[in-house]
Amino acid sequence: MAINALMLSSSRVGNTPYLEHAIEFIKPLSQNTKKWLFIPYAGVSVSHDAYLSMVQQGLADLSLEITSIHQSEDPKQAIRDADGIFVGGGNTFQLLNMLYQHDVLALIREQVQAGKPYVGWSAGSNITGLSIRTTNDMPIVEPPSFNALNLLPFQLNPHYSNYQAPGHNGETRAQRLLEFTVVDPLTPVIAIQEGTALWRQGDSLRLVGNKEGYLFHGKQQEVPLAAGSDLSSYL
């Protein structure tokens, strides 16, 4: 497979402007790919037009032509015509549900497996794994299935942080991911912190950014993955 896919943990790091930190990660995928299609379906409290404008402004330094799938009367043809695909963050359940509604999930997978560059952040990264069972989001809608793009043969958990506020008695993120590994001990979960990403190029997978990631797999819990690690063995 000639997959060239970038899975960003988040659209921001700290108080930095929208997508600013991601430009250096996206640049290698965009040098020969100028016509991009944005998929804004994860946005719930923002209009598709406003979301598109945010992305266009955030990535203006890359001088790309970015249109949105919602502007096309034929979403499938819009995907075929694009040189690359951006999928934004928001609610992962809403995103996956709309991809199923428009019957484009399989087409996106096919196009990316054939070499079309893919960049997702947050929810747009969540859907690149086997399923969305390790998303952080509230299930505000019910997709026909939790099965996702399967561009990566494991589960993702973006925005990873195991911080627990003093006096707060809810589960930590690590505890929630432990629950997943109890019911599905054979499927790995790779958790990535804000400011980092996974970059798959064919049979190569690397953790990019300056923070470590974490592996949850069966009895292996919150195992650190060094920044810059080669994670190709998980493909």
Curated annotation (Swiss-Prot):
Its main location: cytoplasm. It comes from Shewanella denitrificans (strain OS217 / ATCC BAA-1090 / DSM 15013). Gene3D superfamilies: 3.40.50.880. Coiled coil: none annotated. Belongs to the peptidase S51 family. InterPro entries: Class_I_gatase-like, Peptidase_S51, Peptidase_S51_dipeptidase-E. This is Peptidase E. Its EC number is 3.4.13.21. GO terms for cellular component: cytoplasm. Hydrolyzes dipeptides containing N-terminal aspartate residues. May play a role in allowing the cell to use peptide aspartate to spare carbon otherwise required for the synthesis of the aspartate family of amino acids. It catalyses: Dipeptidase E catalyzes the hydrolysis of dipeptides Asp-|-Xaa. It does not act on peptides with N-terminal Glu, Asn or Gln, nor does it cleave isoaspartyl peptides. SUPFAM superfamilies: Class I glutamine amidotransferase-like.
